Amino acid sequence: MNNSSLVVKTSGMRRIDHTAELCIIGGGLTGISAALCAARRGVKVLLMQDRPVLGGNASSEIRMWVRGAKGLHNRETGIISELEEENIYRNPTLCYSVWDSVMWGKVMEEPNIELLLNCSCVDAETETMPDGAVRVRSVTGWQLTTYTWHTVRAKYFSD
């Protein structure tokens, strides 16, 4: 079968438009940290993650604990340290599914973050600026669990 002849009808599917100052694609530890940092400074953030849990490789899906600065007197600081300390308090047996909920809870506590889980970014719309630079204007994600297309317009994007 020639893929160029494949037509997918999407017009009957639900579509939701979102507006944010910052759209972050990817809910790994870097995406979580960027979202929390920006949101705590008053930025309206939309965090799009293609998996059902946050954390990327550090989630229960991959099971790789945070292994940055390790050693006798070394440790991670900032938001990563905050997440790890919350995990030690709530999850003394180091259960991965509880770690997932710690990360999810930190994101959901923040009123300036809108979270889209199970939403894969599949398209980006760009525009050419007067100086010739090209910038992302919006991204579109497909959320398989709800059969919904999400279009996000933002001033800034991070992937």
Regions from the language model: what does each represent?
Residues 159:
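Glycine-rich loop(s) and the adjacent beta-strand/alpha-helix scaffold that form part
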Residues 18-20, 146-156:
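Core beta-strand elements of the Rossmann-like FAD/NAD(P) dinucleotide-binding domain
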Residues 2-4, 9-12, 19, 37, ...:
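Conserved N-terminal/central alpha/beta ligand/cofactor-binding core
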Residues 27-28, 51, 92, 147-150:
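Alpha-helix N-cap/helix-initiation motif
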Residues 14-28:
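Beta1/beta-strand and adjacent pyrophosphate-binding region of the FAD-binding site
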Residues 31:
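N-terminal Rossmann-fold NAD(P) dinucleotide-binding loop
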Residues 138-143:
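Short beta-strand segments that buttress and anchor functional surface loops
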